[in-house]
Amino acid sequence: MILIIILIIVLTVLGGGYYFMMQTKAASQKASGMNSDDQSRTSQTSGSGTVEYKGGTYKYNDHLSNYLFLGIDTRNPVDTYQTQEDAGQADAIFVVSMDRATEEIKVLFIPRDSMTEIEVFNPSGKSLGESTDHINIQYAFGDGKQKSCELMKTAVSNLLDGLPIQGYCSMNMDGIPVITDFVGGVQITVPDNSLEDTYPEFKEGAVVNITGENAEKFVRYRDTDKTQSALVRQERQKTYLQALIQKAQEKAGEDAGFVADLYDSIKSYTVTNMGNDIFAKLLTASGNGITDTETVPGEGKQGKNFDEYQVDKDALSDLIISMFYEKIQ
């Protein structure tokens, strides 16, 4: 059953786009020039107690445990990372929420370009305060390990009106070819023509064998000159993931030790503060399937330098109440 969690982690890594140098520099400049009003944010809900919302009284569902999963756009084993330059960005972000009483799992996806408050640091690690910027670059102001994950945990919690987050798990790009080769590759039918001009072998309708050598270009490539190009590749990612799940399930059925070995193969590319007991609980709950999948509401727009996802804060508060709270009167 570890297979389900591993494949969730793989899904997070399928996000892309890497503008570390330009975006972190721009964020630092904005942080240096902001005033105290820019640093305030009023949440409509909280992570504990009761709240009054649109005429009703709600209580946070304290049976929930929420875990942050991140896909990182950098390479190499994480134990080699030392500074901000090594960290990369959290280009795929979602929260897995488990109800310990009902063993139900819900998933909330957070678009990588969501504009929100992040904490900015200079290269020596000194905080420059908060700035409104893409949530995915919050990871870049850490060390690529626990510090980066903790920063993302805080940023995501703040975006979600103080939602408590009990743990995190991230995996970087090098995990994609490793896990693809470990299952022996997968065969896919190219779902669209989004790669055809750049990689003719990926013509729409073509049947292609995906291996560790070509997996990344199939799932991650996008034309960064086109607005909202991160959304275009989603169908390819879905196709890859479905094929990967099927192949991994076949392998797991043939070999009882396959899943444990698969996890060992990607450990060098992951960062987590979640113990085996937490994964075991998630795995048990995952047997019931995912009961709800949501995306932070908003609209993609072209920013001055990069794509932006403008979060609809009112709709987000509605979603937070419906996913994480219970009405008591």
Predicted regions and their residues:
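Non-catalytic, solvent-exposed segments at the cell envelope interface
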Residues: 15-329
